Amino acid sequence: MLSISQLPSFSLTTAKSLRYPSSPSSSLSIFFSFFPKVSNFVRASSGIPNLVACSPTEIIIPRVNNAGLRIEEIVDAAKGKIRLDSWISSRINGVSRARVQSSIRLGLVTVNGRVVDKVSHNVKSGDEVNCTISELQPLKAEAEDIPLDIVYEDKHVLVVNKPAHMVVHPAPGNPTGTLVNGILHHCSLPCVDYSNSEEDDDSDEETFSDDEEMTTSPSSYAASVRPGIVHRLDKGTTGLLVVAKDEHSHAHLAEQFKLHTIERVYVSLTTGVPSPPQGRIEIPIGRDSSNRIRMAAIPGGVRGGRARHAASRYKVIETFAGGGSALVEWRLETGRTHQIRAHAKYMGVPLLGDEVYGGTKSMALSLLQKRVSRSDQEEIIELISRMDRPCLHAIVLGFTHPCTGEIVKFSCPPPSDLAEIVGLLRRSGL
């Protein structure tokens, strides 16, 4: 079984990385075998260009825009009346509630043939709703001097270790302090206007969205300029992201994500232990009809149009506290929003610290507090009480370099909050 016994010995002040050629060996075992010996970035002798400072390069990426999308439906509200914006949001995947509200206020929605511009208007069963989705409003992303943990950089790509609580790109609720703002400063790019994506909650997605608009051909790219964000991580998720620094690299990496040839490995702490301890879960994922900020695993949802195909492979690395928690490795075959979190919840083992998907602090404490040694109970209470995010970390990222054609792979250790809990659970030895 894969061991990560070296985890507590990691230096957690600055994330380091190990880069190594692809091999059939487990990427995690290689990482944990070599990482304690690595003090700086390691480059294999494989012809990758020397590390260079980022030049002020303009990078064109596609807009995400569902403008003009229309629905004409009769309301079927089983529970009586429902807010107009809530009902429309539940009927359209990939469009944020804020975007729906903007469409209503602009007079693009009618109920029974009459324009309604009040988002809180109630509709009932039998009402006929006509809605046209409005244009995305451009956001201005300004360069900000935000410290970035650069794992690797050359003329074409940038690999970043994203910290917890950093949003990947600006959105209506997060206009500043994002990874994009920091990259604009790092690459000496000017502030830019661009259309925001539809992810207006805490998700940049766990990972890349396989939606068609994310892999639009270069000829249809909009004229706005911003760093080439190819995939995303949730606000609370830490770990590795690759950013394209030119149009060719963006298109090449986007195609790899579309073909699912990118290697993405995550580690998480779960509440409880997955059963069986190793396997593959293939359950479609779609928007949770009862909670707009949450996704849900929906068996059969693809046939009904409510969900999209999603598949994850998992393996229990280590169990703690008599089955109260487990360190789990995840490998993604698809890249749906909140995929790991939704699949873990469906399996009955939500991620520790994931309040949205059921891995609450109270649940974690009920499972762990009495199962650790008495001397460690006070510390486990403190550590879990401080955990304000899902215990999920993107630990390995591998892809084909868009310019050299070489398979490259990067790793970075989990951050201190996750490492401290794992260290305590392992030390407790129950």
UniProtKB/Swiss-Prot annotation:
<feature type="compositionally biased region" description="Acidic residues">
    <location>
        <begin position="196"/>
        <end position="214"/>
    </location>
</feature>
<dbReference type="InterPro" id="IPR050188">
    <property type="entry name" value="RluA_PseudoU_synthase"/>
</dbReference>
<dbReference type="Pfam" id="PF01479">
    <property type="entry name" value="S4"/>
</dbReference>
<keyword id="KW-0150">Chloroplast</keyword>
<protein>
    <recommendedName>
        <fullName>RNA pseudouridine synthase 2, chloroplastic</fullName>
        <ecNumber>5.4.99.-</ecNumber>
    </recommendedName>
</protein>
<dbReference type="InterPro" id="IPR002942">
    <property type="entry name" value="S4_RNA-bd"/>
</dbReference>
<keyword id="KW-0934">Plastid</keyword>
<dbReference type="GO" id="GO:0001522">
    <property type="term" value="P:pseudouridine synthesis"/>
</dbReference>
<keyword id="KW-0413">Isomerase</keyword>
<dbReference type="InterPro" id="IPR006224">
    <property type="entry name" value="PsdUridine_synth_RluA-like_CS"/>
</dbReference>
<dbReference type="GO" id="GO:0003723">
    <property type="term" value="F:RNA binding"/>
</dbReference>
<dbReference type="InterPro" id="IPR006225">
    <property type="entry name" value="PsdUridine_synth_RluC/D"/>
</dbReference>
<keyword id="KW-0694">RNA-binding</keyword>
<feature type="active site">
    <location>
        <position position="234"/>
    </location>
</feature>
<comment type="similarity">
    <text>Belongs to the pseudouridine synthase RluA family.</text>
</comment>
<dbReference type="Pfam" id="PF00849">
    <property type="entry name" value="PseudoU_synth_2"/>
</dbReference>
<dbReference type="InterPro" id="IPR020103">
    <property type="entry name" value="PsdUridine_synth_cat_dom_sf"/>
</dbReference>
<dbReference type="GO" id="GO:0009982">
    <property type="term" value="F:pseudouridine synthase activity"/>
</dbReference>
<feature type="region of interest" description="Disordered">
    <location>
        <begin position="195"/>
        <end position="222"/>
    </location>
</feature>
<dbReference type="InterPro" id="IPR036986">
    <property type="entry name" value="S4_RNA-bd_sf"/>
</dbReference>
<feature type="transit peptide" description="Chloroplast">
    <location>
        <begin position="1"/>
        <end position="43"/>
    </location>
</feature>
<feature type="domain" description="S4 RNA-binding">
    <location>
        <begin position="82"/>
        <end position="155"/>
    </location>
</feature>
<dbReference type="GO" id="GO:0009507">
    <property type="term" value="C:chloroplast"/>
</dbReference>
<keyword id="KW-0809">Transit peptide</keyword>
<dbReference type="InterPro" id="IPR006145">
    <property type="entry name" value="PsdUridine_synth_RsuA/RluA"/>
</dbReference>
